[in-house]
Regions:
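An extracytoplasmic/periplasmic, membrane-proximal ligand-sensing/linker region
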Residues: 6-28, 201-203, 207-266
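Extracytoplasmic small-molecule ligand-binding "clamshell" domains
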Residues: 6-72
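Ligand-binding cleft/hinge of the Venus flytrap
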Residues: 29-38, 128-151, 179-187, 257-261
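Short helix-initiation/N-cap motifs at beta->coil->alpha
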Residues: 43-54, 143-161, 200-202
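Short helices/loops that flank or line small-molecule/ion binding pockets
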Residues: 50-64, 77-78, 111, 155-176
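A ligand-binding cleft/hinge motif common to bilobed small-molecule-binding domains
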Residues: 68-77, 132, 137-138, 164, ...
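Short beta-strand->loop
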Residues: 81-91, 146-149, 182-200
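Flexible hinge/capping segments at coil-to-helix
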Residues: 101-122
């Protein structure tokens, strides 16, 4: 049976951080969403970003909280439709990608990254792969050949910790998630430095399956619109603003710049 026939909404979450942490962070949203919807909400965290896209494509998810790039992929591959965004933290409805390094590694500029070990987050991560890769290329640095070694850590928190513990020389992560790692004591603020910062990136959207019944889609959008001041980890989602697919065209343009064929990103 489709999820809506069971009076249960399935909500997918990308594993931007440790899976347990994501589930804990999402619980207050689920607790508020259930009475607003008049439905049970069941959360699902995949082991990687593409797992959430695949689950939506298989119609196992009704709604998902994507990153901007994983949303663009899901829109093309899984019929996802962005409908809401929560302004988080200082930047509001946008955020930035940063490249961080340990201060004692002598990395001050992008050029200093040559020959170094580097961590991206996930191939489908916006601030942990797509935007920093494009930014490096614009700065004349080829991430495919200029690094000594590249790993995908699986999470922004894992990348920050890898830099802190000297497992890699530098890493690309979301600016807000560096703040979270510092607050949790996983990273010492005075031991890391920011080497590069991206332009503003449109924030992470909540998206629903385009082929859901129209009444259910209206019900979902209306429920999110009523939510205020929802805790998310140490931050608060003050409200949910409507967003449309074209807000993510800048992400599509960046993918094109890297010659990433979205059809092959599976």
């Amino acid at each position: 049976l489709p999820a809506h026939a069971r009076d249960t909404l399935t909500l997918g979450l990308i594993p931007a951080e440790d899976q347990r942490a994501i589930m804990t962070e999402a619980q207050p949203l689920i607790d508020r969403l259930e009475p607003a919807l008049g439905m049970d909400v069941k959360a699902f965290v995949a082991t990687d970003y593409n797992g959430v896209i695949e689950a939506m494509r298989a119609k196992k998810l009704d709604v998902a909280f994507f990153g901007p790039f994983s949303y663009v992929l899901a829109a093309q591959l899984a019929g996802a439709e962005a409908f809401a965004i929560a302004p988080l933290g200082k930047a509001g409805a946008s955020y930035k990608s940063i490249i961080i390094a340990r201060k004692d590694r002598g990395i001050r500029t992008v050029a200093d990254l040559k020959g170094r070990t580097f961590a991206f987050v996930d191939p489908s991560s916006t601030s942990g792969h797509l935007f920093p890769k494009a930014g490096l290329l614009k700065a004349g640095f080829d991430p495919d050949t200029h690094f000594g070694r590249v790993i995908f850590s699986g999470g922004h928190d894992a990348s920050a910790i890898a830099v802190q513990h000297g497992k890699v020389d530098a890493a690309a992560i979301a600016d807000g998630l560096l703040d979270v790692a510092i607050e949790r004591g996983a990273v010492k603020k005075d031991e890391v430095t920011v080497v590069w910062t991206s332009e503003a990136i449109p924030g992470a959207p909540f998206a629903m399956r385009r082929d859901l019944p129209p009444e259910l889609k209206k019900r979902i959008a209306a429920a999110f619109a009523t939510l205020k001041d929802v805790p998310w980890g140490k931050q608060v989602m003050p409200r949910f603003e409507p967003v449309t697919d074209n807000a993510y065209d800048v992400v599509r343009d960046t993918a094109r710049l890297l010659n990433l064929d979205l059809k092959k990103m599976k």
